[in-house]
Amino acid sequence: MRCYAVFDTNVLISSLLTKRTDTATARVIDAIASGDIVPLYNQKIIDEYNEVLHRGKFSFSEERIQKILLMIRQFGLAVNPSPTGEILVDMDDLVFYEIVMEKRDDDAYLITGNIRHFPKRDFIVTPSEMMEILYRDSSGQERIARQFCLPDGHP
């Protein structure tokens, strides 16, 4: 089973900043590589990721930045969103919201550390909440949330 999800930039930053592999932000990124999460993106999101991850205050290596961007493009799905007309606290976040709305028929999620920047919806989740959706407990037993995830082989 796989879930579609849009990753807010802050989740990528947190995953690259952490030294621990057991954090929710690190685990949601690992879920891309394992095929449990299919990232949704468009060029505007890739450009934002690239710009923010290159900011000097983070000091991420070019190799780490390119690796995560390649993983998103390689394992992800490009989406051309329709305008929603939604007004958000931070309008720079609108592209993430519009992409998740474009794929809501496929039960897509938006994963963010800034829940308050978005409307309160059950598909806008923190990295920890996404891990609860994917996994039953800390032993790593997979929980298949059929109403939220896609069967294997679904594009």
Residue ranges and their predicted role:
Residues 105-109, 113-155:
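Acidic, PIN/NYN-like endoribonuclease modules and their adjacent C-terminal/linker elements
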